[in-house]
């Protein structure tokens, strides 16, 4: 998982890191196939590279070896969501939070999945529960997504401000305020997206983040351009491409359908149907 983590924070290319991770994990499994973490890690590599059936089999094997394996619980929840079993997916994530209640990485999936399947009020409650349990881990960005989807733009932008202030990101904060003054909430998103593009010329920015921000601004062409770049790049968030509510503005565009085909392969039509019913 260390190789994947390097890519998550911009120190390496996702595709290269995942292949290095795959080699290391296969060696670990060969050395001791009874260790569940090896199968969990391999499952995540397979999921992020679009090998959905193989990933879900790896997660099941990890859980057979250790029914409380946290990374495998998260992975199986993703598999259940991709198969259309939303309630079962959420149940798995509640198990995950119970197994690892104080580790931030295992408390993030529940509110995010609730957001992805449109259970927005529950997502807010889940975030609040995490804030009480893990006070140092503030999910302002998740609340910003949820409030935006609810049309509560003032609250969404306030959560964006809190997130940016927490990270000391004065550039994006200034872009938000300037864009808001010039063009309202959608202007704020546009200005933030443009600031991310400018930043990408100097340092690492996940192209998925740029595309998602343009989508929230309602700028379909720009959003799809950067989502296409994210597909070439191998951005990890693409595994949820069919489900992110903030991508709704691009959902009916044929170019988005093409991206889904590239991400999900032969399961694209099935997953499109499932995500449309959320």
What is the predicted role of each segment?
Residues 30, 34, 64:
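Short alpha-helical segment in the cytosolic histidine-kinase catalytic core
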